[in-house]
UniProtKB/Swiss-Prot annotation:
Binding annotation for ATP: G233, P234, F235, G236, A237, G238, K239, T240
KW Iron-sulfur (keyword) present: no
Role of this protein: Produces ATP from ADP in the presence of a proton gradient across the membrane. The V-type alpha chain is a catalytic subunit.
Protein's UniProt name: V-type ATP synthase alpha chain
Gene Ontology cellular-component annotations: proton-transporting ATP synthase complex
Key word Nucleotide-binding present: yes
Highest taxon of source: Bacteria
Length: 591
């Protein structure tokens, strides 16, 4: 433990002298109030400290004491359905301790509740040999999450005592005799430094799709469990709603939502909506699988930088249990702005637009902690982390450094489009500029599992949208009447795909989530209509005949998005009606 004294205060950056014994990444207590800070640079005996609390009132001469530990999070029962700030302070218990609606400086509250007793069920016998990652037992944390207690990293040996029963998280639950003869006394909780990735046994290629219930994502731009996606877009294009929708309905075991530098109202929406929503996969409240990290725009800037790492470390902990985890970061641009501010105060050489030269490597560091892995320990298990980051480029300009560095790393780009949002087409994901590099592997996976030709259907639907885009220019110049019947039919089918399939109402109780079976039925109907109508044109029918003769059935296709999941048969029989209707048109008109 080293004690120094402050010689300079510059916003969230404090410089202290007499710190020659300290190390980079050590946590310090700064000033008389004991504010939390982290050493980010050492020059001789001077330490530059990033302070995670408001620094007003700090002055030269005040003491700085190092703890000798890096910034770490507490991992154990009590994480789920809690809300923390960027450095894992529990906001509800912080309010009870301080009787204040705002974060009072210098107050220390344990991250996990020390008073709650959790029922621990041992799954291992005394005398058994264990090593890092082995599951010792379970704690039923919520109706949905079975919290697995694992041997901490770096510990291996023989279990000499373990007992089932009710324990708080700091009571000794088991004892391991290590290989060197010393004894390790273990609790239900372990600590881990946030800037260090938790080790795994083996990295695997992601294959299984993350089903989000959002048709444009699942069909055209899928992300796998263990993949990484970016959602850039201008203000008002719907980034936060896309993130909320994925957090609500993704088929994962755990969701970690990091509100990083965005408005506080968005976190309030999450707190109001999530407890009332039912997870379609488990039938329980969505809050029972969610951890919230709130670092809103009115909280200290430096803590934004930590919040992303806090979230991904928690995600790695649940992945090590063998769970699939989705982490949403809204927004990584605010995190990058925090990096830029600290870099400027450290007087480092600026890169593009004032961001530090190491911006790209920091963004890569975060996204590379996502993935599908075979984790350490027995029984053998796989876990996944899917990282979805919103990016808020100023003015919607995706050529700026944060977006460009993000797109170099992630394999899925959901590009939100201001013109689509202005036309009230939501989700406003532009199907011509967005992409997914997982598309082929996901299509092959679904074709094999569901025994469908999903891949070819998606390709055909996308072809219609691309042909519509090239025909739109002709229509704008010389009018729709200049098009042939075949081209007008292409425009009509593309319009159906856009309005009846891609457009989705997040605030409608039925349309907010679409299962894969319903998505497939809806798209099949549109493509059946395309096949039958093209066939009728080949046999001599007119475009206007086909449109007038299929008004009722096309109306049913348009309304099928509002048909509930338990009435799927009503959607599936529409394809028979389309075929019947086109046959009637051929019998009465055409040749």
């Amino acid at each position: 433990m080293t004690q120094g004294k402050i010689i300079k205060v510059s916003g969230p950056l404090v410089i202290a002298s007499g710190m020659q014994e300290a190390n980079i990444q050590d946590i310090c207590r700064v000033g008389k109030l004991g504010l939390i800070g982290e050493i980010i640079e050492m020059r001789r005996d001077q330490a530059s400290i990033q302070v995670y609390e408001e620094t007003s009132g700090l002055g030269p001469g005040e003491p700085v004491v190092t703890t000798g530990e890096p910034l770490s999070v507490e991992l154990g029962p009590g994480l789920i359905s809690q809300m923390f700030d960027g450095i894992q302070r529990p906001l509800d218990r912080f309010k009870l301790a301080t009787h204040n609606d705002f974060l009072v400086r210098g107050v220390e509250v344990p991250s996990l509740d020390r008073d709650i007793k959790w029922h621990f069920d041992s799954t291992i016998a005394i005398g058994q040999k264990v090593s890092t990652g082995d599951i010792l037992g379970t704690v039923k944390e919520t109706e949905v999450v079975n919290h697995k207690i694992m041997v901490p990293y770096g510990v291996s040996g023989e279990v000499v005592s373990i007992a089932s029963g009710d324990f708080t998280i700091d009571e000794v639950v088991y004892e391991i005799k290590k290989l060197d003869g010393s004894f390790y006394k273990g609790t239900l909780m372990q600590k881990w430094p946030v800037r260090k990735a938790r080790p795994v046994s083996k990295r695997l290629i992601p294959e299984e799709p993350l089903i989000t219930g959002q048709r444009v994502i699942d069909a055209f731009f899928p992300v796998t469990k263990g993949g990484a996606a970016a959602v850039p877009g201008p203000f008002g294009a719907g980034k936060t709603v896309v993130q909320h929708q994925v957090a609500k309905f993704a088929n994962v075991d755990i969701v970690i939502y990091v509100g990083c530098g965005e408005r506080g109202n968005e976190m309030t929406d999450v707190l109001n909506e999530f407890p009332e929503l039912i997870d379609p996969n488990t039938g329980q409240s969505i809050m029972q699988r969610t951890v919230l990290i709130a670092n809103t725009s009115n909280m200290p800037v430096a803590a934004r930088e930590a919040s992303i790492y806090t979230g991904i470390t928690m995600a790695e902990y649940f992945r090590d249990m063998g769970y699939s985890v989705a982490i949403m970061a809204d927004s990584t641009s605010r995190w990058a702005e925090a990096l830029r501010e600290m870099s400027g105060r450290l007087e480092e050489m600026p890169g593009d637009e004032g961001y530090p030269a190491y911006l790209g490597s920091r963004i890569a560091e975060y996204y590379e902690r996502a993935g599908r892995s075979q984790v350490l320990g027995l029984p053998e298990r796989e876990g996944t982390i899917t990282a979805i980051g919103a990016v808020s480029p100023p003015g919607g300009d995706i050529s700026e450094p944060v977006t460009q560095n993000t797109l170099r790393i992630v394999k899925v780009f959901w590009g939100l489009d201001a013109p689509l949002a202005q036309r009230r087409h939501f989700p406003a994901i532009n199907w011509l500029t967005s992409y997914s590099l997982y598309k082929d592997s996901v299509g092959t996976y679904i074709d094999g599992k569901e025994k469908t030709d999903w891949n070819s259907k998606i390709t055909r639907a996308m072809n219609y949208l691309q042909r519509e885009s090239s025909l739109e220019e002709i229509v704008r110049l010389v009018g729709i009447d200049s098009l042939s019947d075949n081209e007008r039919l292409t425009m009509e089918i593309a319009k159906q795909i856009r309005e009846d399939y891609l457009q989705q109402n997040a605030f409608d109780s039925v349309d907010t989530f679409t299962s894969f079976a319903k998505q497939e039925a809806m798209l099949s109907n549109i493509l059946t209509f395309a096949d039958q109508a093209n066939h009728a044109l080949e046999l001599g029918s007119y475009f206007t005949e086909i449109m007038e003769g299929t008004v009722a059935v096309r109306d049913r296709m348009a309304r099928s998005k509002y048909v509930s999941e338990d009435r799927l048969d009503e959607i599936k029989i529409i394809s028979n009606e389309i075929t019947h209707q086109i046959h009637l048109i051929l019998e009465t008109g055409g040749l």
